[in-house]
Amino acid sequence: STVCADYLVSELGVSPNSVLKETSSYDTIGNAYFSLTIHAAPLGWSEVCTVTSAFHMPRARACFDWIYGACASAPRVAYLPVADEGMTEAALEARRRREEESAAALRRSAEEVGADLAAISGWLHSTHRCYAVNRQHEWGEPTEATKEELETY
């Protein structure tokens, strides 16, 4: 979010006083959870916009729909996909496959955990590799991602 904030301010001329950063997340599900709990819900926002690459948008949308859908006071979420540029066709296909697999896993988790923000918080902080203290020893270990998939990050 720091790079995005810099871009908004330096390239688009947005006032720094109009930009809020979310720096607690390590991934998309964290973006959804922390943007809601740190900014959107406490500040009573009426709308947020999720901007990401087209290949990533289906999973991003699933994350934001699940998390924001679990909060009665959550704002409406708009989605703005941007073009998939800057990678080979093979890398893009590898990433699309990875995104589909990750989206399927997310849907299974959402079904299991349900649409309750407290339950989602419990799940996120007890089972998710990025946020569960009982899994922090796994940081730095190889992921299941292939070399082609990793090149797209």
Language-model features, listed with the residues they occupy:
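A structured, mid-to-C-terminal "fold-capping" secondary-structure block
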Residues: 85-153
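A structural signal for short, hydrophobic/glycine-enriched beta-strand patches
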Residues: 1-105
